[in-house]
Amino acid sequence: METQRASLSLGRCSLWLLLLGLALPSASAQVLSYREAVLRAADQLNEKSSEANLYRLLELDPPPKQDDENSNIPKPVSFRVKETVCPRTSQQPAEQCDFKENGLLKECVGTVTLDQVRNNFDITCAEPQSVRGLRRLGRKIAHGVKKYGPTVLRIIRIAG
């Protein structure tokens, strides 16, 4: 009788362990990797964008060292995206699009959560300072040439 009771108890325990084991993979499958969370954030940025073309992840900075493995806590991210040849209206995933030659580059910073269900992100993207500075310089030079170019040409003709 005692052996039968122990066997029944062992069977219940095994059943509970089996059920617990089946439940755990589904819970862990809901956690995204750092890269997957950033890719999702980039996809959502494309969906909300009003720009003509899609942007694709170009470079992802490594995740910061954190002891906290809680997938609900926002993780800081930093990455760069580059304009692709695919129009935003296309149904093609950005990851399948080629980068546009001389396409616009954007630096993005913010936070993402690794929880696949919540999937929260707060990302801000902007052109890199050096690109903005060069573009501003180019506009000033073009404006100066347009404004003072004819005068400079007259001076060169007179002097030459």
From Swiss-Prot:
Q: Check the record and name the InterPro entries matching this protein.
A: Cathelicidin-like, Cathelicidin_CS, Cystatin_sf
What domain of life does the UniProt record list for this protein's source? Eukaryota
**Annotated signal sequence range:** 1-29
Query: Where does it mainly reside?
Result: secreted
State which residues form the propeptide.
30-131
UniProt keyword terms in alphabetical order: Antibiotic, Antimicrobial, Disulfide bond, Secreted, Signal
Pfam families linked: Cathelicidins
MF terms (GO), sorted A to Z: lipopolysaccharide binding
Cellular component per GO, a single term: extracellular space
Annotated TM spans: none
Cysteines paired by S-S bonds = C86-C97, C108-C125
Q: Name one GO biological process term.
A: antimicrobial humoral immune response mediated by antimicrobial peptide
Q: How does activity depend on temperature?
A: Thermostable.
**Subcellular location field:** Secreted
Stated role: Broad spectrum bactericidal agent.
Q: What PANTHER family has UniProt attached to this entry?
A: CATHELICIDIN (PTHR10206), CATHELICIDIN ANTIMICROBIAL PEPTIDE (PTHR10206:SF2)
The family note in this entry says: Belongs to the cathelicidin family.
- Protein's recorded name: Cathelin-related peptide SC5
What organism is recorded for this protein? Ovis aries
